[in-house]
Regions:
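Eukaryotic scaffold repeat domains enriched in small/polar residues
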Residues: 1-342
Length: 342
């Protein structure tokens, strides 16, 4: 898909909330499957697994919930998982900081394989965090505690690496999230340096995004990054409880603070729980809508933005509303742009 010359940005309205406590506790990441399926990675102390959910949510709360994996050190288990991605076959790849490995499952949740060893040498991990496929099907891995980015084949053969500890261009301090766009650019959420860095597919530095055009909107511990088909860049600004949006040149465009409502499954649950309804009647409902420690963002082919609202046990979903422009509907880039009115 080629990118448009420009966009008429009509807005980015809130669409819905998915999940609830007991169903999607502490979501850390999201991946898209076929037929409107969502794979939601859940993580808390002593518990970790993937919840299979749907964009349609659920009509009612049920104990018959489908999950992949469980907590532990053995094959098919997780201790401290961070991110998950899916390929064309709907196979699921999951990084695990504590197990220093990448685990692979099929779409039905059957364990296929696991690779990775702890160490500081090339091809070894020390807390693998973000993962992303590149345009050749290789896997880019954020080797967080080794402060570097490594690339592997999809079966775990080491290809190359770049980066080291520091705060200069091309250096990292406990990086976390990563995304490779369709042009091959690598975007890294440089957690400890409070910025996002962008690189070529070979690891050459392109640019840094670390603040916006509005005072007070500097990043604080960004945990995730994603890029949509238009080239717009989204950052989960974890330490500031928000998601920031930039255009392909790193120019600030938008921020998401949270607009959550009760999900379909939560409404069904509340209608069977009189005590919870009384507590909600007494609560400050406005505060409940805001994001709390959003850890990851994902954008699907329909330009739906899904935010893992970690400390609120839910996903918040927004729908991008933008019209693609061509050479007939937008001027060429101006050297000294200014807004004028007739």
């Amino acid at each position: 898909m080629s990118r448009p010359r420009g966009l008429l940005r009509a807005g980015y309205p809130y669409l819905k909330t998915l999940g609830m406590r007991r169903v999607t506790n502490f979501p850390i990441d999201i991946a898209f499957g076929k037929d409107e399926i969502l794979y939601v990675l859940l993580r808390e102390s002593g518990n970790a697994f993937i919840r299979i959910w749907s964009f349609d949510d659920a009509e009612s709360f049920t104990d018959d919930l489908v999950q992949i994996g469980s907590y532990g050190k053995n094959a098919g288990q997780f201790q401290w998982p961070v991110q998950l991605i899916t390929n064309a076959k709907d196979e699921i790849y999951v990084s695990d900081e504590a197990n220093h490995s990448i685990s692979i499952f099929n779409s039905k949740g059957n364990f296929l394989s696991r690779w990775g060893k702890q160490g500081t040498q090339k091809g070894y991990f020390n807390g693998p965090a973000g993962i992303s496929f590149d345009h050749e099907g290789n896997i880019v891995v954020v080797d967080s505690s080794n402060h570097r980015i490594q690339k592997y084949t999809n079966d775990g053969k080491f290809i190359c690496q770049f980066g080291k500890l520091g705060d200069k261009e091309g250096e990292f301090k406990r990086p976390w999230g990563v995304h490779v766009d369709e042009l091959g650019k690598i975007y890294v959420a440089d957690w400890g340096n409070h910025r996002v860095q962008v690189f070529t597919n070979d690891g050459d530095f392109i640019m840094v995004i670390d603040e916006t055009s509005i005072a007070g909107l500097k990043m604080k511990y960004p945990s995730g990054v994603a890029v949509d088909a238009h080239g717009d860049i989204y950052v989960s600004d974890w330490g500031n409880n928000r998601v920031l949006m930039f255009d392909s040149n790193g120019r600030y465009v938008w921020r998401f603070l949270g607009d959550a409502t009760l999900s379909k499954v939560a409404r069904s649950y509340m209608m069977t729980n009189a005590y919870s309804n009384r507590l909600r009647e007494m609560a400050n409902i406005e505060e409940d809508k805001y994001l709390r420690k959003p850890t990851s963002i994902r954008i699907d082919s329909k330009f739906r933005l899904c935010i893992a609202d970690h400390m609120s046990y839910r996903l918040q979903v927004y729908q991008k509303d933008a019209i693609e422009l061509d050479e007939h509907t937008i001027f060429s880039t101006m050297r000294n742009p200014s807004l004028t009115t007739a």
